[in-house]
């Protein structure tokens, strides 16, 4: 029998329905792969082996009765930001040490309803704050990719680095992730996987640990475009428990795969051409335009004049919302509690010990921009800029642009021990320069691998769509995928 971990979601789904193998066999193959590789890659922070085998056995029963859901028997990894009933959920932060929720997030509940199997919880940057998966309390995740002729450890991107690394290393068929400023798309680009950040409101945020509530959105990371389409259909839903959830029909995203894009207008924003950007990324961007032109699309130049202000505005808004959301972690009701002579000292010691440096930095920034005298100067101004950025995108779509093509990141994955980036917050934040405008406006965006750098590392292109037009950007992403091919890391781990 072929290595079952090499199958995509679509291939595994079809084979399970035909009875080529059982869900328990597929799940066991992944659990064995995790046991060997996780000590090296550190993608999982908790492995739920017994629960996985139980869920797989239930899937086999439903498959035998012809009652299969759209993800029946498919083993998935779950980012540690999603609440999973009675299973370790900490946002990879020490302050939530030992927390096991007595409720299930809407996104994961949707997946289980459709027959998916949970392999475990995936590593991530603490509270989703980071671009390299180095801020996790459980240590960094190692990218399965390596440069040609080098054994240097590379970052997998962040904050969903565990999700992207696990998918790339065949430690799950697909994974849930979240995206506040690029945390699905950037890790996908760094690991040669596909990741889609849906429109804000498409997937419920209920039961997902909040970072910045007006920016957070759940989405899938998969091995190819079709897999992301299949997962997104299950993850998306209207949810009355989430006041920002949108009550719109959920399309069968897989049906758009393979459809023609002839006559579509693809916008190329001039503001994304940065002087310091890698020439390889510029060449890849041009190659992506050529792929789409050959498929019958029309390439048009557009302008998004206010996106140059997106990154600083994003870090003001995100930090402000984070400082408010993280105020709930006080050691009183759940998670870590440090001893103190009174409640104030207990608060101080708990939060000081429980939060990592990056989280503390963002809380301090957020508290500052929300403080008296600075609220108008920073937070209100950032929200006004956000409106201007939205207007720029609205104007482009109003003139008939169907989607916008940009790079995902200015460079390929960088080294885990890259002190130049590690010790420079601005350099780290610049990893999100092409992705944050999408979150500021709430639009859908997908990252698709489009080539390799000269050092053999994957590079991705981003497609940005109109609100709730995920099927359009998936349709276009599939064209790029077919032209560029798919990319797999050469296995060096056990």
From Swiss-Prot:
Classification via InterPro entries: Amidase, Amidase_CS, Amidase_dom, AS_sf, GatA
Enzyme Commission designation: 6.3.5.7
Recorded GO CC terms: glutamyl-tRNA(Gln) amidotransferase complex
Any single GO BP term: translation
Domain of life: Bacteria
UniProt xrefs under Gene3D superfamilies: Amidase signature (AS) domain
Gene Ontology MF terms in the entry: ATP binding; glutaminyl-tRNA synthase (glutamine-hydrolyzing) activity
Catalytic activities: L-glutamyl-tRNA(Gln) + L-glutamine + ATP + H2O = L-glutaminyl-tRNA(Gln) + L-glutamate + ADP + phosphate + H(+)
Residues at the active site: 79, 159, 183
Keywords, in A-Z order: ATP-binding, Ligase, Nucleotide-binding, Protein biosynthesis
Broad EC category: ligase
PANTHER family: GLUTAMYL-TRNA(GLN) AMIDOTRANSFERASE SUBUNIT A, TRANSAMIDASE
Function: Allows the formation of correctly charged Gln-tRNA(Gln) through the transamidation of misacylated Glu-tRNA(Gln) in organisms which lack glutaminyl-tRNA synthetase. The reaction takes place in the presence of glutamine and ATP through an activated gamma-phospho-Glu-tRNA(Gln).
Subunit structure: Heterotrimer of A, B and C subunits.
NCBIfam families, per the entry: gatA (TIGR00132)
Family indicated by similarity: Belongs to the amidase family. GatA subfamily.
Name of the molecule in the record: Glutamyl-tRNA(Gln) amidotransferase subunit A
